[in-house]
């Protein structure tokens, strides 16, 4: 498949804009869209953000994380389909769907352990399905966001394998609008393949291997 490499020049990423609710966006993305519809990224190619390059070494989020580009960043878009691609080596979050509607994410392979805040999938959306994905990342694997007054709602996550040095599945930290009608089922939580940045990876504590606390979720001890 085709290999698409992200630029390592920060000057190529400049998407600052205000939201209607008064907040200011400072993030950018290799693949960026705002206010668009009928977007598809499909096929079996690889998108590599080259996020380990020295141009993106600013430290963690508090020290300028949003200056680093994401690989996919869609804002206020609808009818989005992202299937079967491989996403690697993001400088920041791998993919972020903010204030989006009608999103289908299926069959992705996500691997990113090259920088701080390497979340695998951050979704702040309505009416979304996420399925059959393999996500192995340094920070949160799948993270639900609610960064604006609207609910993050009507989302299903199923048949995914997540591996993370932080949180496999997380709600927040941005939790302004809240969450509603979100289902996570038949997922596997594994240890991350690498632990390059914060060295958070360790055995789960106070959990017995013979205790299942969430139906349909397997945890590798």
Protein language model regions, located:
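Extracellular/periplasmic carbohydrate-active domains that bind, remodel
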Residues: 1-221
């Amino acid at each position: 498949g085709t290999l698409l490499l992200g630029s390592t020049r920060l000057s190529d990423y400049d998407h600052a804009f205000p939201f209607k609710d008064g907040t200011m966006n400072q993030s950018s993305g290799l693949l960026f869209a705002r206010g668009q519809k009928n977007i598809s990224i499909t096929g079996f190619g690889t998108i590599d953000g080259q996020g380990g390059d020295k141009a993106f070494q600013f430290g963690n989020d508090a020290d300028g994380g949003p200056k680093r580009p994401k690989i996919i960043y869609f804002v206020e878009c609808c009818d989005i389909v992202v299937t079967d691609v491989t996403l690697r080596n993001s400088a920041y979050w791998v993919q972020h769907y903010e204030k989006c509607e009608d999103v289908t994410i299926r069959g992705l392979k996500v691997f990113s352990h090259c920088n701080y805040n390497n979340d695998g999938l951050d979704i702040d959306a309505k009416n979304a399905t996420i399925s059959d994905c393999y996500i192995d990342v340094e920070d949160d694997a799948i993270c639900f966001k609610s960064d604006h007054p609207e609910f993050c709602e009507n989302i299903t996550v199923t048949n995914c394998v997540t591996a993370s040095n932080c949180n496999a599945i997380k709600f927040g930290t941005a939790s302004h609008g809240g969450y509603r009608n979100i289902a996570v089922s038949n997922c596997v939580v594994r240890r991350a393949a690498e632990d390059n940045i914060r060295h958070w990876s360790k055995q789960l504590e106070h959990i017995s291997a013979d205790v299942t606390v969430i139906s349909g979720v397997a945890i590798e001890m």
